[in-house]
């Protein structure tokens, strides 16, 4: 019965590539996008930000990647987390020593934004990576102050100032002496991940790594 229902559902809502929207058979990504997405390569996978030991991103934030992220965040496409998380998981396994990571966490949303959106896209990605690399997911941070959306601020110094005092560690004992992988969807100036890493290290974390789906192209 379930198979019949799934078949009917697939006729009404055929699977589409999460990036270009092309109707496909079973996968979440079409063969063309799989080959031509703006992947980071070599040293461009890595970025260094204050308080972050290593930050990696498999894709550049442009074209179909940018559109997919916007749909994922603002159009209720939470199902995208499976494919986007798989891309990030592969990047983590290729560029980090996942066996040394004690926990995976994410950048938190404010209560209002979480309520309005219905989910935290960074948490969905973090949980996908957690399953793929077999490292537990732990929500270590909480947003305690509403601030102006970082995406509306262009100046790097103002972005850094905008996130100071916005986050707190929920349980310092949990992070003390730990190696933590912090997850977010996109990194631009690095202000948010830097501030979250600062708070985690202030609470006693030994190392904080970061992975995002995409990064700004320099």
Which residues does each PLM region occupy?
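Glycine-rich phosphate/pyrophosphate-handling loop used in enzymes and phosphotransfer proteins
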Residues: 1-218
